[in-house]
Design a protein with these regions (language model features):
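Structured, contiguous alpha/beta core segments that scaffold functional sites
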Residues: 1-243
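A contiguous, surface-oriented mixed alpha/beta subdomain in the mid-to-C-terminal portion of proteins
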Residues: 162-341
Length: 341
């Protein structure tokens, strides 16, 4: 006589198995017969970066503060103020920027126009640049221009920064991208919990569960899709049962101290983001807890930030252009000479 075995299957709802977006510069892709290097695993890394900037208040506040500080220090006779500001934003958000350069027949610069960096792709030798508003869409149009070519009357000047992975730049806060994702997910989770007015941390026991393994997996999948994830936090559970004996049991888990865990996670991820920028939180309006911050301490922190972060960023940005295209000015709008490397 065979032993009667009970099969118990435990499913974990809400597991996170999607890896963070990666920069992969080894794959060559084709788009409208153009051969370019993929910008990320799915050629969407800059879109991912920009979305992170738009959704994370801390990241946006730091980047906006840095750009504002740099913009006050630069001027150009060849680039409009608006385009110069956009170049600075791309420089900090993506780690690089791109502009369209128009030259006369004698190769004198006539005009420089800003190009959204997320729309640029390049070939493996960084000699050809491709521009499209709809990468990945078969209906998108692609423009092809020589890259960083001073002998062409129409070209793209492409700056990929000092920190690169192959042909594309890496933003200075790359190490904090996971923390930025967590910050955004925490906000989404709490918003969903408030909207649904129900915050559950439960085990669902499916009674009379004599189902095949395939059916169990399908039930688990459906529950995961409907109730797991930050965007589904706090949804009401509605079940239909043929009898009370066969009803599903929902057991609420108490004592997990989720509030404390979220507070600790929120604090550690914020610190991680500021560390990536080598910034003190108080410089961007986030005051330290349980202790004061004097004017002297603020001034010292600002001086260190200017010396170690802002000045190097400023010099690198100005030197990335041809001499005289972008210049540094003092508080009286007087030009400060910079020795080109």
């Amino acid at each position: 006589m065979k032993a009667n075995k009970e099969q118990i299957r435990i499913g974990f709802a809400g597991s996170f198995d999607e890896p963070i977006k990666r920069i992969n510069n080894n794959s060559i892709d084709f788009f409208n017969n153009k051969k370019y290097v993929s910008y990320g695993d799915n050629n969407d890394f800059p879109q991912y970066i920009y979305k992170a900037y738009m959704q994370c208040g801390i990241l946006q506040g730091i980047i906006n503060g840095i750009v504002d500080s740099l913009y006050k220090r630069v001027k150009s006779n060849d680039i409009s103020d608006d385009d110069l500001l956009k170049c600075l934003y791309d420089y900090i958000i993506f780690g690089g920027y791109a502009v369209e350069v128009l030259r006369s027949k004698t190769l004198r610069i006539v005009k420089i126009n800003y190009l959204p960096f997320e729309n640029i792709r390049v070939n493996s030798t960084k000699t050809i640049g491709y521009y499209s508003n709809k990468w990945g869409k078969y209906t998108g149009k692609t423009s092809e221009l020589p890259l960083n070519d001073d002998t062409s009357t129409h070209s793209i000047y492409y700056y990929s920064g000092r920190l690169t992975r192959g042909v594309y730049p890496v933003p200075m806060y790359f190490s904090a991208l996971k923390s930025i994702e967590i910050q955004n997910d925490i906000k989404t989770f709490h918003l969903s919990t408030i909207k649904n007015n129900f915050n559950s941390n439960v085990i669902i026991n499916i009674n009379n569960g004599n189902y095949t393994e395939e059916t169990q997996r399908e039930i688990e999948k459906l529950i995961n899709e409907k109730f797991s994830g930050a965007e589904n936090a706090g949804k009401m559970v509605l079940m239909f049962n043929d009898s009370k004996d066969n009803a599903a049991d929902i057991v609420r888990l108490e004592g997990d101290k989720f509030d404390e865990k979220y507070q600790a996670l929120d604090k550690s991820t914020k610190e991680d983001i500021f560390i990536a920028f080598r910034a003190t939180p108080c410089l961007f309006g986030l005051m330290p807890e349980n202790n004061g911050f004097s004017k002297e301490e603020y001034a010292e922190a600002m001086n260190l930030f200017e010396e170690n972060v802002l000045e190097p960023l400023l010099l690198t940005f100005v030197k990335s252009f041809k001499a005289g295209v972008v210049e540094i000015v003092d508080n009286d709008d007087k030009i400060i000479e910079v020795t080109q490397a």
